[in-house]
Amino acid sequence: MDSWFILILFGSGLIHISANNTTTVSPSLGTTRLIKTSTTESAKEENKTSNSTSSVISLSVTPTFSPNLTLEPTYVTTVNSSHSDNGTKRAASTESGGTTISPNGTYGTWLTDNQFTDARTEPWEGNSSSAATTPETFPPADETPIIAVMVALSSLLVILFIIIVLYMLRFKKYKQAGSHSNSFRLSNGRTEDVEPQSVPLLARSPSTNRKYPPLPVDKLEEEINRRMADDNKLFREEFNALPACPIQATCEAASKEENKEKNRYVNLLPYDHSRVHLTPVEGVPDSDYINASFINGYQEKNKFIAAQGPKEETVNDFWRMIWEQNTATIVMVTNLKERKECKCAQYWPDQGCWPYGNVRVSVEDVTVLVDYTVRKFCIQQVGDVTNRKPQRLITQFHFTSWPDFGVPFTPIGMLKFLKKVKACNPQYAGAIVVHCSAGVGRTGTFVVIDAMLDMMHSERKVDVYGFVSRIRAQRCQMVQTDMQYVFIYQALLEHYLYGDTELEVTSLDTHLQKIYNKIPGTSNNGLEEEFKKLTSIKIQNDKMRTGYLPANMKKNRVLQIIPYEFNRVIIPVKRGEENTDYVNASFIDPYRQKDSYIASQGPLLHTTEDFWRMIWEWKSCSIVMLTELEERGQEKCAQYWPSDGLVSYGDITVELKKEEECESYTVRDLLVTNTRENKSRQIRQFHFHGWPEVGIPSDGKGMINIIAAVQKQQQQSGNHPITVHCSAGAGRTGTFCALSTVLECVKAEGILDVFQTVKTLRLQRPHMVQILEQYEFCYKVVQEYIDAFSDYANFK
């Protein structure tokens, strides 16, 4: 029921009660009460002896006011009866009865049972042979004091009612401001919607007491494991204990009618005390408003501006804010569209220059990487023909790996992304603008990770609960889900356990000298300790369901190497045949583009058709083979191509068109035809012969050459997945994928991170880079590449 309807009913009730209180007795009439009397048969004569009972009772009610009580009268009831032995009057004072509210609504003192018995329930004591009911009229009394008291009481009730109404008005305004509404309506991406959308908010925490103190970093892993038990039960409790928002905060500016269309979600609004104020535009009412809030960093006030993703109608305001706040860095943690819904308007041109209100934006450079894209913009105020006003360089870091649902699979990409943002933002610049769609969930997650990493370095402890509580006082619902909350802890643990392992190419020599030294107190050197950390990563066998199905077990060459569900390569099901969508292969994300590699086992004789169906379905034009068909007398891979002529594998026919021997590998050009579709494609196979049956290659030259040849082929054939296989699809396959990724990063940015590259691969497929020698080989090849960089300048 509507709260206003309830208030009206409540008010009506108060008025009704007040009316009853002030009209209980007419001032001009006495009070009449029916008293039942009884006499003996001989009592007709009034002057008989005391054996006759004359029960004429005189009962008067007179209000008596105590000087100490201003509002409540004390009633003294006097009962006159000739039945008394001495004929005197008996007075019933307040001491013999309890002060209550009488049935007619007036205050009074009720007599006890031995003082007064209602004639409606029991007759008077005595002979009941002749009972009569006689009306008795009390004399009129002056009721003016009663009326005055009741008027005063009514006034107090009315004042109380007004106070409640005013409180409810304030509560409703606060609720409209988005403090703790639980309703939601997801964005549908239509810019013409009349009403802004809303998103789900969490209920207010019933308690703000501090149950979650800061954690020392050496207790971090233990605590995270404890809280993640029982499906993150303790983490959910901690998250639900967070305060939603400060009760005193208001959102008056955001709630104005003129500003409603500027909000993407109706219940995610900036507080008045922390919102970003734009310079008002002359003649445009409320032009100082934008849905953005200042947010503190770890020890830096207003380090960030948390903003909603711009709408089409607020793009100009967004760039006005960037200019006025002297922002140099924009962090975008959403894609323009997710689940076919518009999450953010594209507020930059794809190329060239475009004016947005009074700010002109031109694109200077774009770098696309696997987890994020970096765009550099040059901005200048419009109308500056003389170029007197300086141009400014703005860098946008667009994190593209956040999934539509949940959080990233691993925090590694986010940590690398955050490091880039920290390194790029200049000292002189204003606040870093961070936005997702609503500007609270992913935005809050980014801000908290940044602050807690700073706290970790400064104090050797983290205070996630406390920091989230504080920034929620600046913008509601920062860190919006328990999954985001857990992801923050995972990112902090990742950084604590493994640190920053990224290197500048110029420091590789120093690093290699360091990792070959023995670690004091152990028999291992640094390299062995690094690899030991990699092998300690748990293999998640419970996430390999399809590969372990009985129908698919025989399709696996090595039972310890099964693809994970989340990234396994799926092929079309054969008509009328179940479990024919499985092949032992995994999509792998390298440096620049998602799913750039397919890491596959070497086909078995009975899975060769599935292998070619995979090649056709995913349009792979490059195959890298890192094993011989047979090694040490054991079959390592079925021959899946013809030595000459053509061979059919189901609907796929393969014809050898050309074979060329290079220094350490063979190139075969194959014409692959799908007879069902009547289409053909050219596919090139690179068969590497430089890997010995035991150990690793003696040098990295052959591997560098084949990687360069494959990259060149990719440029010509298009960016479709490169299929890489050895025998089991893990050891040599992982080494090739790791080296391709690291060398590409070296060439593009002059940095490398062998440890995290291999760690990421192992999270995508078990046992990638399988042995210590293969891990060491990665470092050696990178070192060779850097030493002879000029010789491989054409590596693209």
From Swiss-Prot:
Record-linked InterPro entries: Prot-tyrosine_phosphatase-like, Protein-Tyr_Phosphatase, PTP_cat, Tyr_Pase_AS, Tyr_Pase_cat, Tyr_Pase_dom, Tyr_Pase_rcpt_a/e-type, Tyr_Pase_rcpt_alpha
Catalytic activities: O-phospho-L-tyrosyl-[protein] + H2O = L-tyrosyl-[protein] + phosphate
Domain Tyrosine-protein phosphatase: 235-495, 527-785
List of residues binding substrate: D404, C436, S437, A438, G439, V440, G441, R442, Q480
Keywords: Cell junction, Cell membrane, Glycoprotein, Hydrolase, Membrane, Phosphoprotein, Protein phosphatase, Repeat, Signal, Transmembrane, Transmembrane helix
Keyword Glycoprotein annotated: yes
PTM sites of type Phosphoserine: S205, S207
One MF annotation (Gene Ontology) recorded for this entry: protein tyrosine phosphatase activity
Membrane topology: Single-pass type I membrane protein
Active site: C436 (phosphocysteine intermediate), C726 (phosphocysteine intermediate)
Enzyme kind, highest EC tier: hydrolase
Membrane-side (Extracellular) residue stretches: 20-145
Cytoplasmic side: 170-796
EC numbers on record: 3.1.3.48
One GO cellular component, as annotated: Schaffer collateral - CA1 synapse
Localization: Cell membrane; Cell junction, Focal adhesion
Reported modifications of this chain: Integrin binding to extracellular matrix induces phosphorylation at Tyr-792 which induces PTPRA localization and recruitment of BCAR3, BCAR1 and CRK to focal adhesions.
Phosphotyrosine PTM sites in chain numbering: Y792
Secretion signal, residue range per the UniProt entry: 1-19
Gene Ontology biological-process annotations: insulin receptor signaling pathway; integrin-mediated signaling pathway; modulation of chemical synaptic transmission; oligodendrocyte differentiation; positive regulation of oligodendrocyte differentiation; regulation of focal adhesion assembly; signal transduction
Transmembrane portions of the chain: 146-169
Biological role: Tyrosine protein phosphatase which is involved in integrin-mediated focal adhesion formation. Following integrin engagement, specifically recruits BCAR3, BCAR1 and CRK to focal adhesions thereby promoting SRC-mediated phosphorylation of BRAC1 and the subsequent activation of PAK and small GTPase RAC1 and CDC42.
Family, similarity comment: Belongs to the protein-tyrosine phosphatase family. Receptor class 4 subfamily.
Quaternary data: Part of a complex comprised of PTPRA, BCAR1, BCAR3 (via SH2 domain), and SRC. Within the complex, interacts (when phosphorylated on Tyr-792) with BCAR3 (via SH2 domain). Interacts with GRB2.
Protein name: Receptor-type tyrosine-protein phosphatase alpha
Natural source organism: Rattus norvegicus (Rat)
Organism placement in taxonomy: Eukaryota, Metazoa, Chordata, Craniata, Vertebrata
